[in-house]
Amino acid sequence: MKPEDFRASATRPFTGEEYLASLRDDREIYIYGDRVKDVTSHPAFRNAAASMARLYDALHDPQSKEKLCWETDTGNGGYTHKFFRYARSADELRQQRDAIAEWSRLTYGWMGRTPDYKAAFGSALGANPGFYGRFEDNAKTWYKRIQEACLYLNHAIVNPPIDRDKPVDQVKDVFISVDEEVDGGIVVSGAKVVATNSALTHYNFVGQGSAQLLGDNTDFALMFIAPMNTPGMKLICRPSYELVAGIAGSPFDYPLSSRFDENDAILVMDKVFIPWENVLIYRDFERCKQWFPQGGFGRLFPMQGCTRLAVKLDFITGALYKALQCTGSLEFRGVQAQVGEVVAWRNLFWSLTDAMYGNASEWHGGAFLPSAEALQAYRVLAPQAYPEIKKTIEQVVASGLIYLPSGVRDLHNPQLDKYLSTYCRGSGGMGHRERIKILKLLWDAIGSEFGGRHELYEINYAGSQDEIRMQALRQAIGSGAMKGMLGMVEQCMGDYDENGWTVPHLHNPDDINVLDRIRQ
């Protein structure tokens, strides 16, 4: 049974309930040494799953459906999330940006690998299926399937960080490669990372990152899609922040960790059968190398990522402001200046999303893609911005972030609460419970293990720091922008030579130059 078969109607996306039901498919998820029987009820995953289900319910809610959805283009007469159907104009890209933002606000920007993230991949399949050569029909089929149901895909495209100085074909015992061709498909084995939130997805796309050395062995030159319950495919998860928050605290203590933890995992494939209809690239080095720059995903996912980050910075900026209201620090000029810098970062990323659709360009199949210049700026600047914002919060909120009781149970102890009401009260008449609630929220955002993981996530979201800068340079050269910049400099240098100005509208200083008079 396919995940989309859990829907009561084939003309609409999953509801939240149908989405949760589709995850109960005997997938192999392991955490703390045990196999998870049901990710929708296991305390390591259940609130994250419920948060994801809420996104699906929003697609059907009359209050949000119009903002989030439009008609499919597959001929099924249904509707879908706007980012699951490729845009045919700059204005449609704007509508997609707004739909991404609307969905992201339901998690306050804290879940990055929501279904619309990989919708960037699905949309590109429909706009440019010819990129996949002999697997073009597979691309068309997957575009239709992903769009009509709003299937939840994730990807695992990074090889485990082992012998990174060697081409992949020299680490054959670790990296995913073809074992053999069999009747109806291929058998593959190996591992990929970091399969973020894959425990809660329907399918995983397995491919190659943009900066990996592929070597000469075509066994590694492949890309495919696999259902999460494929026999032989396993996820080995990192510790669950949701579970730890439940064991050692409460929603009051860990309001973000408790519900928005996207568990990262090692994806292991042990002789997994992949039918030909799920293969997109096979033994083709050139297509693997060109997939990121030419396949479309590399131009679409940054709009989802930048919009999601902008929503997240709305939240972080608001939480910072409230925290400073707690401490009474907002009246200080220096603090106001630092908060203003955080606001400027927030404004920058919203402005980049405007530029992405505002300077869009037409691509294959009548599709419009976001501005390459704007998305490259986002990919380079976001990893710089997030640590700077975190540092600012640590500086201006300072000890307020840890000047807190251990947990909500301290508030329930009358002997302790009477002290907390005095020594942990907020400024300007704010009660101690409100102050503690605000500062615990901000600590969970930046200081808890959940918060630390988010900093790592944002720093490495787009990949290697060197590579994203080199891609920005290559884009400037390839687009002709660098030629224009050089031309401006050359034009300036052409305005003068060693004898003075070469343009007729300027005056040489022969009549006033003192050095010439002295020399005479």
UniProtKB/Swiss-Prot annotation:
FAD binds at residues 155-157, 196. GO terms for biological process: phenylacetate catabolic process. Pfam families: HpaB, HpaB_N. It is an enzyme of class 1 (oxidoreductase). Keywords: Aromatic hydrocarbons catabolism, FAD, Flavoprotein, Monooxygenase, Oxidoreductase. Pathway: Aromatic compound metabolism; 4-hydroxyphenylacetate degradation; pyruvate and succinate semialdehyde from 4-hydroxyphenylacetate: step 1/7. HpaBC can provide a biocatalytic synthetic approach to the production of hydroxycinnamic acids that is an alternative to, or complementary to, conventional methods such as chemical synthesis and extraction from plant sources. Oxygenase component of the 4-hydroxyphenylacetate (HPA) 3-hydroxylase. Catalyzes the hydroxylation of 4-hydroxyphenylacetate to form 3,4-dihydroxyphenylacetate, using FADH(-) provided by the reductase component HpaC to activate oxygen. To a lesser extent, can also use reduced FMN. In vitro, has hydroxylation activity toward tyrosol and various cinnamic acid derivatives, catalyzing the hydroxylation of p-coumaric acid, caffeic acid, ferulic acid, and coniferaldehyde. This is 4-hydroxyphenylacetate 3-monooxygenase oxygenase component. The gene is hpaB.
